[in-house]
């Protein structure tokens, strides 16, 4: 994009970066139809629907 001089060593990093400029969000939540530019953001979002909390404190278990 004009004015962007970012460079990447891996093509997937460039692909992910291009989405910032295009606004392309190819990952969609099947529950609420919200779209995300990254699959890891969708995975985290889905937990808002399921209530899943996969990370617990080793000290107190919460």
UniProtKB/Swiss-Prot annotation:
Its EC number is 2.3.2.-. A zinc finger (C2H2-type) spans 1-21, 27-49, 55-62. Keywords: Acetylation, Activator, DNA-binding, Metal-binding, Nucleus, Repeat, Transcription, Transcription regulation, Transferase, Ubl conjugation, Ubl conjugation pathway, Zinc, Zinc-finger. One of its GO terms (molecular function) is DNA-binding transcription factor activity. It is an enzyme of class 2 (transferase). Gene3D superfamilies: Classic Zinc Finger. InterPro entries: Znf_C2H2_sf (IPR036236), Znf_C2H2_type (IPR013087). Pathway: Protein modification; protein sumoylation. It is found in: Nucleus. Ubiquitinated by WWP2 leading to proteasomal degradation. Acetylated. May be deacetylated by HDAC6, HDAC10 or SIRT1. Its main location: nucleus. One of its GO terms (cellular component) is cytoplasm. GO terms for biological process: facial nerve structural organization; positive regulation of DNA-templated transcription; positive regulation of myelination; positive regulation of Schwann cell differentiation; positive regulation of transcription by RNA polymerase II; protein export from nucleus; protein sumoylation; rhombomere 3 structural organization. It comes from the Eukaryota. Belongs to the EGR C2H2-type zinc-finger protein family. Interacts with HCFC1. Interacts with WWP2. Interacts with UBC9. Interacts with CITED1. Interacts (via phosphorylated form) with SFN. Sequence-specific DNA-binding transcription factor. Plays a role in hindbrain segmentation by regulating the expression of a subset of homeobox containing genes and in Schwann cell myelination by regulating the expression of genes involved in the formation and maintenance of myelin. Binds to two EGR2-consensus sites EGR2A (5'-CTGTAGGAG-3') and EGR2B (5'-ATGTAGGTG-3') in the HOXB3 enhancer and promotes HOXB3 transcriptional activation. Binds to specific DNA sites located in the promoter region of HOXA4, HOXB2 and ERBB2. E3 SUMO-protein ligase helping SUMO1 conjugation to its coregulators NAB1 and NAB2, whose sumoylation down-regulates EGR2 transcriptional activity. This is E3 SUMO-protein ligase EGR2. It comes from Cerdocyon thous (Crab-eating fox).
């Amino acid at each position: 994009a004009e004015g962007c001089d970012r460079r990447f060593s891996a093509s997937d990093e460039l692909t992910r970066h291009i989405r910032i400029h295009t606004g392309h969000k190819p990952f969609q939540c099947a529950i609420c139809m919200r779209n995300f530019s990254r699959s890891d953001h969708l995975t985290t979002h889905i937990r808002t629907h399921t209530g899943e909390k996969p990370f617990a404190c080793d000290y107190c278990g919460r």
